[in-house]
Structure formats: C-alpha cells, structure tokens
C-alpha cells in the first residue's frame, strides 16, 4: 500500500478514535459517579449537531458563536437529564435507571426527528479550507481540528481532576460515595455536575463529527455503540 494512503488513514483513524474517546470518557464518568451505564450518550452526540445546524443555517450565526452556545445549552440538557432520568431512581436497583436512560435515548431521537425532520442535514464546516494538500497527501482539515481539540480537552481534564478542588471532590465521589459524604462532600451535587460534564463532552464530539457526515437522528446510535466499546476496552 502506498505510504501516502497510510498517512491519510492514520489521520482518519486518529480523528475517529478521538471522537469515540470523548464519548467513552463521558460514559465512564457517569458510570463511576452514579454506577449506571448511560445508553443515551449517543443521542447526546446527535442532539447538539442538529441544534448547531439549525443555528448556523437559520440564524446565520458564525461557528465561533454557535459552538459555545450549543455547549452551554447541552450542559443544561445534562442537568435536566440527571434530574429527570437518574435522581428520582437513585436509590433503586441498577435496572430501572438503565431503562430510564434508554427511554431518554428514544425520546431524544424522536424529538430530533419531530423538530428537525427525518431527512439528513449538512452541517457547515467551521473553516473555509476544503483540504490540506502536502505533496501527494490529502488531509481533511476537520480531522486536524478533531485531533487537536481532543488532545486539548484531555490535557484540560487531567489538570481539572488533579489540580482543582472541584475535580478532586468529583474523584472522591466516584471512588467512595460514603466516605466522600462523611467528609462533607455533597455527592448529589457532584453527580449532577458529572452528568453536565459528560453531556458537554458528548456535545463537543457531536460538533466535531457533524461536519464530516450528514447529521441525522441515527448518527448517535453507532457513535454511542463504538464509544461504549471503547469504554469497555479502556476499562470502566
């Protein structure tokens, strides 16, 4: 195989792997904090892509305005998700909460179809550069954006959990809820913040992958499945 094709495949693999890593990270965060598997994580990737397409096309706002607004909006969605799907069932067994997240997944998918239609949509790219051409190597600039953004987020997350008080409180909650509560850590608040954080990670994944493919109500299903596989391989 030509070495130029190998390089192009490398960038493609790194970019898509970065997307699945963000999804997997969100799944793992909720699992460790709340002891549940969030089967709606894929739909939390799909929803912000639809919202961004609507704002970019209908409101004609630039991407640097739309993306932060969508991330904040999805943070609110994450909080509502925790209050509705998890909090009332927090003292129940594992199964009802799992079914609740599946219900949220179905609700979000059908809501997206009702609000934005059944046909796939095209998300405008954040840059005007179509392709990077270096000799015989052709690279989609969106791949570079995905890889760089994911790397920055992973470094920022490491700093957040290791250097900030809130991050350490979230870690303590994930490791031992009873001990964290005895130390005065508000574990209910930490779990809610974890849901918000996880949803915002899914949002970033949706905004990054949206320009590469058509935005449809089905896009979250496969992405969520691959992210779930990544979480299993990486270890919950």
Identify what each model region corresponds to.
Residues 24-33, 52, 77-78, 82-83, ...:
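Alpha-helical transmembrane segments of polytopic integral membrane proteins
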Residues 29-49, 63, 91-96, 166-169, ...:
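Short, non-helical or kinked segments that cap or interrupt transmembrane helices
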Residues 60-104, 111:
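Alpha-helical transmembrane segments within multi-pass membrane transporters and channels
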Residues 88-163, 190:
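Transmembrane helix-bundle core of multi-pass membrane transporters
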């Amino acid at each position: 195989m030509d070495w130029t094709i190998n390089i192009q495949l490398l960038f493609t693999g790194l970019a898509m792997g970065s997307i699945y890593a963000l999804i997997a990270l969100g799944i793992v965060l909720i699992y460790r904090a709340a002891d549940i598997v969030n089967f709606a994580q894929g739909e939390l990737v799909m929803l912000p892509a639809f919202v961004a397409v609507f704002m970019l096309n209908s409101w004609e706002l630039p991407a640097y305005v739309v993306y932060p607004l969508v991330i904040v909006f999805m943070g609110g969605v994450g909080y509502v998700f925790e209050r509705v799907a998890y909090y009332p069932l927090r003292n129940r067994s594992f199964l009802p909460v799992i079914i609740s997240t599946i219900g949220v997944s179905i609700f979000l998918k059908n809501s997206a179809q009702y609000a934005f239609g059944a046909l796939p949509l095209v998300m405008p790219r954040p840059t005007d550069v179509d392709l990077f051409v270096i000799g015989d190597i052709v690279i989609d600039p969106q791949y570079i954006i995905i890889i760089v953004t994911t790397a920055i987020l992973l470094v920022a997350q490491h700093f957040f959990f290791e250097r900030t008080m809130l991050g350490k409180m979230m870690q303590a909650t994930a490791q031992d809820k009873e001990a964290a509560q005895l130390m005065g850590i508000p574990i209910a608040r930490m779990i809610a913040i974890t849901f918000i954080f996880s949803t915002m990670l899914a949002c970033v994944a949706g905004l990054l992958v949206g320009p590469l493919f058509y935005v449809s109500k089905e896009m979250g299903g496969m992405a969520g499945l691959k992210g779930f596989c990544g979480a299993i391989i990486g270890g919950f």
